[in-house]
Amino acid sequence: MSRLVCDDSRLEDPRLIDNERLRWLAGAGARIRRAMLTEPVGALSRADRPRGVLVIGSEARLVRAVLEPSCPVPFMAWPGPGLPAWVGPLDLVVVLGHRQSSAWVVQCAAEAVRRGATMIVAAPESSELARATSSSTTTLLPTTDGDPMAAAIAVLAMLGDLGLGPVVRPEHVADAADLVAEICSPTADLSVNPGKDLALGLAERLPLIWGGTTLAGRASRRIAEAIRRASGVPALAADDGELDTLLRAVTPKDLFADPGESDQLEPVLVLLDEDKLPAQLVGTADRLARLADAVDVRIVRISSGDREFESSDVESYVTLLQRGLYAAAYLEIALTPVEEAL
């Protein structure tokens, strides 16, 4: 397999305006707005408070990360494959699907309907999942764009309106996604583009990613997945204990060594929203940064914005995630097989 090297000149190619991945990322705000404006089929009210809430399907863990701290009833994100025995007529089952939902998701959802559970289903109207869950107790949120995050935000807004979680304003979340698209646009020069700058900070290195809060941790895992796909490098999102162990095992650089002699990737520590951590996590971030500095490991930071500008947890999550996904997209563009770079 050819070793990949970074060619930063590719990041200034005017043809990037037509890059399919970048165009998809730029459309995140529009997809969130479309999902918000979709009229639900069926309706629930705040009076219909369930005994418990079960969420299955794509982005179930995102819904859990947002709702778990404030949901007034027991809440669970279920990995499948079977439906828990306790689910019944007093419970709410939320299903996040798409046109080709996994067979176990469809089966679980259909079983929940048979047991009389109240349902919220996000899926295309013509999908197998929508057909399998059609009932008098089902509220369908029709989706059209195939964007699990947009569907999840629409569901979170509905659950917030029902008093089952925090208030989520999709229009504000969409604005946050649009702002990232603007500053990370392929037409923005490298000197002012945080997506391109972050991509170069990650290039030819092994990213070790830490997000201290629940939602930042969720974003860190999604970003690590995107970097692995973009570069083939085993980027790792982990908790502070694991990263502590890895950083302590790093051998400090030999100032006299020839960097071209080793094929081993140097690590880079990526800290998410380090400037917005709750007080109990500030010391953890400082410790990781000191460990990295002690062994000459580069530190790069992804922020969801200035502290003085208030934003909801979901807005911050989307900002972090989109910045990381832009960086992964630019990293893929910049990486060139060695033979082509010569």
Model regions and ranges:
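Phosphate-moiety recognition in structured ligand-binding domains
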Residues: 1-40, 117-125, 129-137, 143-144, ...
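Active-site phosphate/pyrophosphate-binding segments
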Residues: 12-20, 24, 28-45, 144, ...
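Short, highly selective alpha-helical patches that border small-molecule cofactor pockets
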Residues: 25, 60-64, 105, 151, ...
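Glycine-rich phosphate-binding loops that contact phosphosugars or nucleotide phosphates
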Residues: 47-181
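Structural motif
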Residues: 55-59, 96-99, 122-124, 210-215, ...
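Short helix-loop-beta junction
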Residues: 64-76, 224-236, 290-295
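A generic structural motif
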Residues: 75-82, 122-124, 233-245, 296-308
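Glycine-rich, anion-gripping cofactor-binding loops and their flanking helix/strand elements
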Residues: 85, 93-106, 247-282
